Amino acid sequence: MKKTMKMLATALLLSAICLSACEKPSLAEETNTEEQETKDLFHLSFRVAQFEHIPFNQAIDMSRATDVKQVCTRISLALFKDGVKVKNIHQDTKDAHFGKIDVTLPAGTYQVVAIAHSGSGSATITSPEEISFPKNKMTDTFYYSQEVTVGGNASYQLEMKRAVAMFRLVTTDAIPTAVKTMKFYYTGGSSTFNAMTGVGAKNSRQTEERTVTDAQHAGPGQFDVYTFPHTPSDVLKITVSALNASGDVITEHTFEEVPVKVNEITQYKGSFFQGTTPADANVFSFSVQDEWTKKEYAY
């Protein structure tokens, strides 16, 4: 009996040694696989360095190589492979390296989409053809869209193109103190962007409100709103309402067939509050401006 137990113990010991020996190559294989996967990843650096067109804001230095912090407060970058989003990064001006985004990716061909804007939240890049913004509210917006082939470490300097057209209302008369808000309701443009075509992706009904400042009550007012035209040139129908604190309309004007163009300011300038009644006939001037280009129209 003792001899049998001794033989059994010896057999178990030999089995354990064999199992241990068999497992070692498996562990080595896993380690080699991990090392191989790491070696197959490449470091890519994207720097938002230039803007093809200068900003609408004339207070900013007019240069085609404007610092991103002077133009926008948010950047979103997404990479797609075979139509599937594989990377999605958002930055704002609180980030120490705002304007510089680093990623690691395996070899392959990718569609890169970058959006720079100053909205209340990050842009949603659902696909290169569908980019939207929080509450469909728009600001001056720039984009980059390019296919890249990854086969090694690389750096990319992104030259951003302006994506929007601007409508600017200039009132030459003082705004009544009862007016607290200027409301813009407009159709004909889009609040969703297609980075592959560089134009609007959907037919949108856009509403923007601008608070009237004390300075504007004392003199002329200027109000800017944006849209993505469906073609490089498009037309809008815009209704502008002056509202009191309760949201009641004090006076209102509708502008038909307003021409808009990407990277262009369409400016309507005139006396908006003549008699502060909607029945008054006002004449507005019209103009337009590049880099921003501007065209002005009288109303």
Regions picked out by a protein language model, each given a short descriptive name:
Residues A11, A16-P55, N263, N282-Y299:
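Bacterial Sec-dependent N-terminal signal peptides
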Residues L41-S45, S76, Q111-V113, S155-Q157, ...:
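Beta-strand secondary-structure signal
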Residues S132-A163, R168-T172, H253-Y299:
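Extracellular beta-sheet/turn segments enriched in Thr/Pro/Gly and aliphatic residues
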Residues R47-Q70, V170-A178:
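Structural motif
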Residues R162-M166, D173-T177, Y186-S191:
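Short loop/turn and low-complexity linker motifs enriched in small/turn-promoting residues
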Residues M1-A9:
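Bacterial N-terminal signal peptides that target proteins for export
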Residues Q36-F46, F56-D61, K161-A165, S233:
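Short coil/turn motif common to extracellular beta-sandwich-like domains
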Residues T66-T126, K180-V262, T293-Y299:
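Tryptophan-paired
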